Structure formats: structure tokens, C-alpha cells
Amino acid sequence: WSKNNGGAIPPNMLQIPNTESNSHYLKMCKLLGIKGHPARFPAALPEFFIKMLTDESDLVVDIFGGSNTTGMVAERLKRRWLTFELSKEYVAASAFRFISNETVASDIYSKILSDEFAIIE
């Protein structure tokens, strides 16, 4: 496994630092007084697998969406994506991964919680 095979076989251990505590998502949660998802992981983790297993425009599905790190990475890598999450609060807060404006983020968060239709562009 330690031999470089030119990418044919991925390594059996990924070394990815967890810098999630400095993320835009958490900053927006704190700014708006919202509790963020407790089990976040670094974007480099889904990025590794999305790049290895999919091509642009492929569909990425995350059945335990949480704060939607996987959806954010899939979007950035030009993949289509679906995310499922039981907690409406986590779904609403996951919009922060795609929004930089505090006022817009607060509005989208409220709309999702009140079952209003919201489009993030």
C-alpha cells in the first residue's frame, strides 16, 4: 500500500486535518445564534471520494446530511447532489454553506424552518 501506483489504488489511510472549527458555516451559526451540527467533518474527506468515484455532472447522494459538507463539496466540484437529513434545524443551517450574506442567511434559515419555499442562488 505504500508504493506509489500512480493513483490506481488510493492509500489505506487519509491524512486530513480537521479545520472545521474555523469554517464559514460555524461563523454564520455563531453570528445568528444558532447551534451548529455537532458532528462536522473536513470538506477534504468527501472531496477525496467525490473526485475518486464520480465525474462532473454525476449525482452524489448523502443520506445523513448533517451540516451538508458533502453537498457543498459536490456543488463546488460541479456534481449534482441530494442530501437527506431528519432535523429541520440542521437542514436550515446547512444553507449557510452556500450563503455569505448574514441577512440573506437569516431569511433563508427562517423560511426553511417555517416550511416556506426557498431558493439559494
Task: Indicate where each model-derived feature is located.
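Class I S-adenosyl-L-methionine
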Residues: 1-121
